[in-house]
């Protein structure tokens, strides 16, 4: 009850009581207006003190309610995003766990923080895999899409020689595409008749080079090319013959060793080299032997001098 109704007293004189009641009411209203004007200044301080009067339990309930609302908003935002396979998102899951821990620890974080973490999560989804990650053993080979695919492709096991790539003709009889490589001795036996043609060609070119009329008419560059060709053909023919001779020497030596043996014995590469050198040295002339011995002596001295220079340093 207000102050006015508390001070009302019962009386029998109605007219006089009405006048006095009106005066009292006016006085009370005036005092109330003055009190309100004075209390406006203190209203802000009283509002601040209102929160301090609340209990800790009510504050905790309000805080939990706000957190539940924030989590619900985040779940609604994450629903449209398509989840990736389990193997591809270990980093994303770790990031989500960190977000939830941070939301629980920070009670005053708003919806802006949730949006920030959501953007970070999207960046993790769009981030490419590490290039240095170990590839599977049986994974298909990867080629850059920026590089144009060549019309002639390399087949593993059938590597094309550089000469064939440059457009120079290659004999199909000696390519790997026809099967395994044939033994050199078999090839040599089949195409030994070509040596006669090579020797005739060398003789014909030497005859032209010795002809003065041809030399005067031909250009100097053409003559030099012919001389170079003659030298290369001679060296190739001689190397083929030397190789054939070495194989024959080893074959004869192994034949003598394996006479009367059930199991054939084959020499190693180092032993073959020694047998060939011994045969050549035995079948040399006296002057050739002296030259070979002198060459070996100089070679040995050079090695010794190098060793002395190394120790003097």
From Swiss-Prot:
Predominant place of localization: nucleus
Keyword terms, alphabetized: Coiled coil, Nucleus, Ribonucleoprotein, Ribosome biogenesis, rRNA processing
Record's compositionally biased regions (Basic residues): 127-138
Record has rRNA processing as a keyword: yes
Parts forming coiled coils: 188-244
UniProt subunit comment: Associates with 90S and pre-40S pre-ribosomal particles.
Protein known as: rRNA biogenesis protein RRP36
Organism: Candida glabrata (strain ATCC 2001 / BCRC 20586 / JCM 3761 / NBRC 0622 / NRRL Y-65 / CBS 138) (Yeast)
Gene: RRP36
């Amino acid at each position: 009850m207000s102050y006015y109704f508390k001070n009302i007293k019962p009386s029998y004189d109605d007219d006089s009581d009405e006048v006095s009641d009106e005066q009292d009411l006016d006085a009370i209203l005036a005092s109330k207006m003055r009190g309100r004007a004075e209390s406006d200044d203190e209203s802000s301080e009283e509002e601040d003190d209102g929160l301090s009067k609340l209990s800790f339990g009510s504050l905790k309930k309000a805080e939990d309610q706000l957190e539940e609302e924030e989590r619900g908003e985040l779940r609604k935002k994450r629903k449209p995003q398509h989840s990736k396979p389990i193997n591809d998102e270990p980093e994303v899951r770790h990031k989500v766990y960190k977000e939830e821990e941070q939301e629980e620890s920070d009670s005053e974080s708003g919806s802006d923080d949730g949006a920030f973490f959501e953007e970070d999560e999207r960046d993790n989804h769009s981030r490419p895999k590490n290039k240095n990650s170990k590839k599977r053993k049986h994974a298909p080979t990867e080629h850059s899409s920026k590089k144009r695919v060549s019309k002639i492709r390399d087949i593993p096991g059938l590597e094309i020689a550089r000469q064939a790539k440059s457009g120079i003709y290659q004999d199909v009889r000696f390519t790997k595409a026809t099967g395994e490589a044939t033994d050199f001795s078999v090839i040599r036996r089949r195409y030994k008749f070509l040596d006669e043609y090579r020797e005739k060609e060398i003789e014909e070119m030497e005859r032209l080079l010795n002809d003065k009329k041809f030399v005067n008419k031909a250009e100097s560059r053409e003559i030099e090319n012919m001389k170079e060709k003659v030298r290369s053909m001679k060296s190739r023919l001689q190397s083929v013959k030397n190789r054939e001779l070495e194989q024959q020497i080893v074959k004869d030596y192994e034949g003598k060793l394996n006479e009367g043996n059930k199991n054939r014995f084959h020499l190693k590469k180092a032993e073959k080299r020694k047998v060939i050198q011994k045969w050549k040295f035995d079948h040399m002339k006296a002057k050739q032997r002296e030259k070979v011995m002198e060459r070996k002596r100089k070679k040995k001295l050079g090695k010794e001098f190098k060793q002395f220079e190394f120790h003097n340093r």
